């Protein structure tokens, strides 16, 4: 950033009309502004709940964009049609990878409607407490992937003695086995090699089932776009993120949904979202959630404060406010309709 005018000591530094810090000293016009001369301090935010809210003008159904999607029995629509091999713990990761790796493009050539066979593994699931928020989060994540519309079928593998018991995980999610959602326990089938063989056999049985689902023309209103920052630098808020924001506005106008995830990434600029919240109550939920994060991180080594990672700083971001400002631009200018508090 370059100072556009003379900036007096302790004056507010604004980016996109949002305060990202204060001048450490008198700074002449033309001076580079970065972490060496921008001081991070607490800024009183004007949430102005719902002041700028405008209902989105949706296109009539007959004018909305379409795409070729896979329609699922429950009404969800997928953009891909994978068979997923998931794990209850890291103990089953090798088995999951070996099963998935068996299905090369050549072996899948006879099933053109199958996007692939892919492993979803984790380093967790064993050597951790059996109850509490971390196990709950792991289970919701695994079963969330298993039931994602982009999976036409899923096999969840487990060693059998891990802390994340596979039966408990299914029960926690309120799910039962079916033709397209199966359990595979390594100890029950006789070890790693036999589990790989059994997994391959099951996938071979699932391939014609999943392949029977074909793409069809559907409205863009079925699309759900998840937004996440990655590798932020000084240009993210000028290029990639605003471009995503524009795409979000177009998607919502066509009846679709966008989710601005990782609420910690908007710390310090949440007032730019509360102003366009559908109701003051929705805006307050966002503020409450940011405050929850601040409380949750007390005493931990991952404080939400003014610092950014060395890579972010080297890339041109002075502090977390500037990073958050760029990250929030992924949400476009569409109204904030709801805040999900489940983490």
Please name every model-derived segment:
Residues 1-8, 13, 343:
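Single conserved hydrophobic/aromatic residue that forms the stacking wall/gate
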Residues 9, 14-22, 26-28, 32-34, ...:
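Alpha/propeptide regions of enzymes that mature by internal proteolysis
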Residues 22-24, 70-76, 142-146, 211-217, ...:
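A generic local secondary-structure boundary/capping motif
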Residues 42, 162-166, 190-194, 232-236, ...:
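Short, well-ordered, mixed-charge alpha-helical segments that flank or form enzyme active sites
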Residues 47-84, 207-212:
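Flexible inter-domain linker/hinge segments
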């Amino acid at each position: 950033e370059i100072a556009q005018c003379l900036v007096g000591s302790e004056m507010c530094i604004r980016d996109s009309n949002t305060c990202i810090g204060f001048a450490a000293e008198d700074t002449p016009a033309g001076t580079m502004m970065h972490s060496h001369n921008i001081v991070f301090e607490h800024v009183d935010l004007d949430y102005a709940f719902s002041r700028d809210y405008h209902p989105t003008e949706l296109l009539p159904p007959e004018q909305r964009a379409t795409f070729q999607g896979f329609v699922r029995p429950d009404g969800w629509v997928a953009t891909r049609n994978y068979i997923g091999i998931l794990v209850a713990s890291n103990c089953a990761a090798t088995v999951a990878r070996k099963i998935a790796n068996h299905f090369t493009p050549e072996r899948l050539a006879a099933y053109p409607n199958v996007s692939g066979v892919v492993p979803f593994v984790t380093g967790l699931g064993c050597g951790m407490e059996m109850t509490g928020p971390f196990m709950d989060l792991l289970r919701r994540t695994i079963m969330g992937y298993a039931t994602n519309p982009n999976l036409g079928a899923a096999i969840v593998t487990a060693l059998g003695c891990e802390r994340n018991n596979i039966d408990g995980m299914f029960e926690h999610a309120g799910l039962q086995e079916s033709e397209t959602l199966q359990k595979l326990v390594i100890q029950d089938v006789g070890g790693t090699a036999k589990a790989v063989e059994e997994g391959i056999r099951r996938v071979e049985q699932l391939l014609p089932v999943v392949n029977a689902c074909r793409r069809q023309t559907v409205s863009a209103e079925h699309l759900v776009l998840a937004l996440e920052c990655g590798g932020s630098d000084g240009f993210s808020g000028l290029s990639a993120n605003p471009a995503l924001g524009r795409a979000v506005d177009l998607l919502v106008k066509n009846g679709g949904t966008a989710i601005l995830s990782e609420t910690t990434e908007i710390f310090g600029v949440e007032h730019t979202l509360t102003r366009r919240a559908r109701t003051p109550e929705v805006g307050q939920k966002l503020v409450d959630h940011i405050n929850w994060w601040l409380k949750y991180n007390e005493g931990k080594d991952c404080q939400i404060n003014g610092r950014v990672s060395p890579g972010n700083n080297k890339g041109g971001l002075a502090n977390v406010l500037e990073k958050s400002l760029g990250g929030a631009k992924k949400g476009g200018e569409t109204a904030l309709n709801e805040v999900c508090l489940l983490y």
